[in-house]
Amino acid sequence: MNRLLWTPKQDSIQNSRMTDFQNFVEKTIGKKFKNYSELHSWSVHDLNQFWGTLWDYAPVIHSQKYEEVFRSGARFRDAKFFPGAKLNFAENLLRKKDESLALFYRGESGAEAQLTYSELYKRVGALAAYLISEGVGPGDRVAGLMPNVPDTVLGMLATTSIGAIWTSCSPDFGAKGVLDRFGQIRPKILISTDRYEFKGKSLPLSGIVTEIAAQLPDLKKILIGEYPSIESKSLEKRMESFPKNSIPLEESYKPFWGKEPSFFQTTFDHPVYIMYSSGTTGLPKCMVQGSGVFLNHWKELALHSDLREGDGIFYYTTCGWMMWNWLVSSLSIGATVHLFDGNPFHPSPEVLFKYAADRKIKIFGVGAKYILTLEKDKYKPSSDLSSIGAVLSTGSPLPGYGFEYVYDSWGKGLRLSSISGGTDLNGCFALGNPNLPVHASELQSLGLGMAVEIFDDSGKPIHEQKGELVCTKPFPSMPLEFWNDSDGKKYEGAYFDTFPNIWRHGDFAEILSNGGMVVYGRSDATLNPGGVRIGTADLYSLLETISEIGDSVVIGQEWKDDVRVVLFLKMSPESNLTPELEARIRKDIKEKVSPRHVPAKIVQVADIPYTRNMKKVEIAVKKTVQGEPVTNKDALINPEALEYYKNLPQLSVD
C-alpha cells in the first residue's frame, strides 16, 4: 500500500456532490450502495440506468427527449447514446445569464480581462449571428489559432451554438503544425489574435496567419481579436499586416449586437469538436466528438472534482490540449473559469500561485511536469493557498515523491487528484474522488460509467497486476468518427486492433485492491528486456531524485534478437556523466526500482525531445536511434533535439 497522504472528513463526504448524486440514484431508482466501488460497478453494468440518471441529475437542457439512453451496435463504435434527443452543446454551457463572473483572464504580463455570464451570452449571440451571415451552418468548421484568452471561449460557444464544429490550435505549433491539422478539416472561418506573449516576449501572429490562410481553400474570413495587454491598444495598426479578408473580431459582431443565441438543436451525436492526436507518428488524426463530451465533462467536474456554482477553477493549458475543452465545460456548472496565457514560470515560479491566491481559486490544475519541475528545485510557494480545495495533475504519471512534495510544500489540507485519460475520449478513465483517501502515486478511482479493466497480453482480465488499460464498454464521449476516414480503418486501427471490440487505450497500468490505479507509462513505450514488460514511470521517478540529472528518456533498443534498455541523460548545469555517477545510477536503479530496469547503456545527450503538451517521445527517440524516419517532427516543441540521437557509436557495440 502506498503512503496515505489525505483522508476526507466525514462531513465533507456527506456534503459532496458525489454523495448527493448517490442519494439521487437511491431516491429515483431505489438503488443503494455501501461504497464507491458498488456505485461504480452499477454505473458500468447498467449503462442505461447510469447515463439516464446522470442526464436527469445534471440536468441536460434539451428540446426533445431521447427514445432510449443506450443502443448497442454490432461493434463498440456503433453504439449510440440518447438517440432521438435534440439539444445544443453551447446552450448547456450557457445556462446562466446573470451578472456573476463567467471568465477571468490573467496573462504573464499581468494584463487582466473578465466577462460576466450576461456579457458572454450577449457576445455569443452577436458573433453567432455574424457567422450565420457569412454562410456558416451546421457541420461547417470554424478554427481558432488562439492563445488561452476569453475570445477563444467566445469563438467556441458561438460556433457550437449554430451547430458548426469548433477546432483549435495553439500559436506555438508553427505554420506546418497548424496546416497539418486545419488543412485536413478545411475551415470556413479562422479566428486568431494580433499577437501573444511568452517569456516576456510579444510574438506577432500576422506572419503565421498569412501563411496558413493562403493554403486553406475554403476560408472566407479571418477574425482577429486583440490580445489582452497592459500596453496601449494598437489593433487597428496591426491589422494592416494581416490578409485582406481579415477584420477585427469585435467589429465583426458589432452590427449584430442584441441578437440572442439561437441554439440550433442537434442530435446527441452531432459533431461539436474536432480534436487532434499528437501527430508524432504521421499526420495528426482528426477525432470528431459530439455532445457526449459535455455530459462526460459534467460528470468529471461536478462529481469527481466536486466543482460547484460560483467556484473558481483553473487549469494551466493551451488551446491545443484537451484540458482547455475540459476546463471550459466548467461553465455548465456556473463556475468561474480562470484562464492564463504565457509561461508558468515567468517572471518567477510564483506566478500561478499568486493567481490562485489573488482569485481564491478552489480547483487548481497543472501538468505533472510542472509539479516535478518545482519539486526538483524544492520550491515552496509564498502565496496563501488556503482557498485551494483540490489540485489536479495530468499529462504524465505523477510519482509518489511528487505527491509528497505537494503535501509538504503547498498544503496538507488539499485533495491531490492525479487524473488520466486522453484527447481520444476528451476526458478521464481514472481520476479524483472527493469521498476517497489520497495515496502517493495513485489515481483515486475509476471514472463513473467507464468500464475500465487491465488485460494481459492474451486479452484476459488481470487484477493487481500490470498490463494494458482497456475499456470494455462504449461511453458517450468516444469519437463519433475520424475525419476523412470513410471506411473507419483509422478509427478501428487506433483502438481495436489488439483486442477485438475492446478499446485498448495504450497505457500500461494496474488497478489496485483499494480500487485506485497506478499508470506506469505509455504501453508502446514499455521496455521488454528478455520478454518481460516493464513500465518507464518507476525509472523516471527515481531519476528525478538524482540532482546531477536534469532530464531523461529511456527506450528499448532492438539488439541481437532481444531488447536492451538504453537510458539517455541530460545533465544538470555543471554536471557530467562520470563513471562514478554512472555506477551510482545503476546501483540505485537495481536497488530501488528493479534489476530488470538497469540500463545496458547510459548515454549523455544535450537535450530531451518533447511534444507541445510536454510529453516525452520515447518512440521518436527509438526510431531515430534505429535509423528509422520520424515522420512528423513538427509535433515536437524541440525537434532539433532528435539530432543528438543519430549514429551514436556507443549503441552499435555490446
Q: For each predicted feature, which ranges?
A:
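AMP-binding/adenylate-forming catalytic core of the ANL superfamily
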Residues: 144, 169-195, 209, 345, ...
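Conserved AMP-binding/adenylate-forming
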Residues: 303, 357, 389-391, 397-516, ...
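Conserved pre-ATP/AMP-binding loop-to-beta segment of ANL
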Residues: 99-101, 224, 241-276, 283, ...
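Conserved AMP-binding/adenylate-forming core of the ANL superfamily
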Residues: 37-42, 103-157, 174-179, 245-252, ...
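Conserved AMP-binding/adenylation subdomain of ANL enzymes
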Residues: 292-312, 321-362, 377
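AMP-binding/adenylate-forming catalytic domain of the ANL superfamily
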Residues: 221-224, 591-616, 629-653
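Structural core segment of the AMP-binding/adenylate-forming
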Residues: 161-251, 360, 367-368
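Adenylate-forming
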Residues: 147, 189-208, 229, 318, ...
